[in-house]
């Protein structure tokens, strides 16, 4: 059985006792809000199913005194959740897509890429600097960010500022900003602030010419067991075609560059007039060196889902059998082409030096 037939079968089975779908999530407030939103959508689609949310801490949640890029481990926010999937303790896991590596461990796949919210970064200012911008902050002001990508781009753009690592969940980082006198501002993902209902704290949105965003930023990904056809069918309806195609291009670019948390890589994508545009860049740690370019490809964004073959291999960790294959392959090839272009221009040297310097500090 293909398509939503399996999902319908799940919804009908076990009556009168309803089948319970167990959903894994990180414990942070933002992770819970994100998971609740996905579960609410699934409940509306499948009123015959019950959902149980199981929250757990991950390595990235526990190690709070070290910059993410220094911990030296991929899957910082996903490993414990994947163990639960593997042991059949949960049926699906909701993540921020940017936390999911472009190569997933064997046996797992991203079964849904949900509609993207704002992918841009935002600046939140200390109360005494409200009304300022990064440009107008005093000389030597300290700006907190946990991301090499943000720090590299912003040091290049705003050399009068100093950038320092700040860790913790959103609540913790905002508290550190407001209560300590250490930071004049911090950089956070706009989507996270919006989901928490903290739009009023956004003092400045950073547009691509100031700071391109992380691969997958603003989108949620639903990770499942790769061979669990029932659950794949269940969550597949959550795929947002435009978000999916943009994120396949972004993840393909990152994967082909062999980038990750330990190097500054950023992107910007857009679909306009039947064209998918991908801008990607790499930076040295201090932002002094950079290499960027833009490419485009013709793409057809499907209006509705359709059933596809069950044996199609994953693309950059994503399974989307209900979205036509051709545009997915076009998006993947665009990412590969742009990465190849930058590598041929010498991007590997910038990334290698950034990686070595990051590991040495």
UniProtKB/Swiss-Prot annotation:
Its EC number is 2.5.1.61. The modification N6-acetyllysine is found at residue 74. Its cofactor is dipyrromethane. PROSITE patterns: PORPHOBILINOGEN_DEAM. Keywords: Acetylation, Cytoplasm, Heme biosynthesis, Phosphoprotein, Porphyrin biosynthesis, Transferase. It is found in: Cytoplasm, Cytosol. GO terms for molecular function: hydroxymethylbilane synthase activity. The modification N-acetylserine is found at residue 2. Its main location: cytoplasm. The keyword Zinc-finger does not apply. Signal peptide: none annotated. Pathway: Porphyrin-containing compound metabolism; protoporphyrin-IX biosynthesis; coproporphyrinogen-III from 5-aminolevulinate: step 2/4. Pfam families: Porphobil_deam (PF01379), Porphobil_deamC (PF03900). The modification S-(dipyrrolylmethanemethyl)cysteine is found at residue 261. The modification Phosphoserine is found at residues 69, 147. GO terms for biological process: heme A biosynthetic process; heme B biosynthetic process; heme biosynthetic process; heme O biosynthetic process; protoporphyrinogen IX biosynthetic process. InterPro entries: HemC, Porphobilin_deaminase_cofac_BS, Porphobilin_deaminase_N, Porphobilinogen_deaminase_C, Porphobilinogen_deaminase_C_sf. The keyword Transferase applies. It catalyses: 4 porphobilinogen + H2O = hydroxymethylbilane + 4 NH4(+). Binds 1 dipyrromethane group covalently. One of its GO terms (cellular component) is cytosol. As part of the heme biosynthetic pathway, catalyzes the sequential polymerization of four molecules of porphobilinogen to form hydroxymethylbilane, also known as preuroporphyrinogen. Catalysis begins with the assembly of the dipyrromethane cofactor by the apoenzyme from two molecules of porphobilinogen or from preuroporphyrinogen. The covalently linked cofactor acts as a primer, around which the tetrapyrrole product is assembled. In the last step of catalysis, the product, preuroporphyrinogen, is released, leaving the cofactor bound to the holodeaminase intact. Monomer. Belongs to the HMBS family. This is Porphobilinogen deaminase. It comes from Bos taurus.
């Amino acid at each position: 059985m293909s398509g939503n037939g399996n999902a319908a079968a799940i919804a009908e089975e076990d009556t009168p006792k309803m089948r319970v779908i167990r959903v894994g999530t990180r414990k942070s407030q933002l992770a819970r809000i994100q998971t609740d939103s996905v579960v609410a959508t699934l409940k509306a689609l499948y009123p015959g199913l019950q959902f149980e949310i199981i929250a757990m801490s991950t390595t990235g949640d526990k190690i709070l005194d070290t910059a993410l890029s220094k911990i030296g481990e991929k899957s910082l926010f996903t490993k414990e959740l994947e163990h639960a999937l593997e042991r059949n303790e949960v049926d699906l896991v909701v993540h921020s897509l940017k936390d999911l590596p472009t190569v997933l461990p064997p046996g797992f796949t991203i079964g849904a890429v949900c509609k993207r919210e704002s992918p841009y970064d935002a600046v939140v200012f200390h109360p005494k600097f409200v009304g300022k911008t990064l440009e107008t902050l005093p000389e030597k002001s300290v700006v907190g960010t946990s991301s090499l990508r943000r720090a590299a781009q912003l040091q290049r753009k705003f050399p009068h500022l100093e950038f320092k690592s700040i860790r913790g969940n959103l609540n913790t980082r905002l508290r550190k900003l407001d209560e300590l006198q250490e930071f004049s501002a911090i950089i956070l993902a706009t989507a996270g602030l919006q989901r928490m209902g903290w739009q009023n704290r956004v003092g400045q949105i950073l547009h691509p010419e100031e700071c391109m965003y992380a691969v997958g930023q603003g989108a949620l990904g639903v990770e499942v067991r790769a061979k669990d056809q029932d659950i794949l069918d269940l969550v597949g309806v959550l795929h947002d075609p435009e978000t999916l195609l943009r994120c396949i291009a972004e993840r393909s670019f990152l994967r082909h560059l062999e980038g990750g948390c330990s190097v500054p890589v950023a992107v910007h994508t857009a679909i306009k007039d039947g064209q998918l545009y991908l801008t990607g860049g790499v930076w040295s740690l201090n932002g002094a060196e950079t290499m960027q370019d833009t490419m485009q490809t013709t793409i057809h964004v499907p209006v509705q889902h359709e059933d596809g073959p069950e044996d199609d291999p994953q693309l950059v960790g994503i399974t989307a059998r209900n979205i036509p294959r051709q545009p997915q392959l076009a998006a993947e090839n665009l990412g590969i082409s742009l990465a190849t272009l930058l590598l041929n221009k010498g991007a590997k040297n910038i990334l290698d030096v950034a990686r070595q310097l990051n590991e040495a500090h």
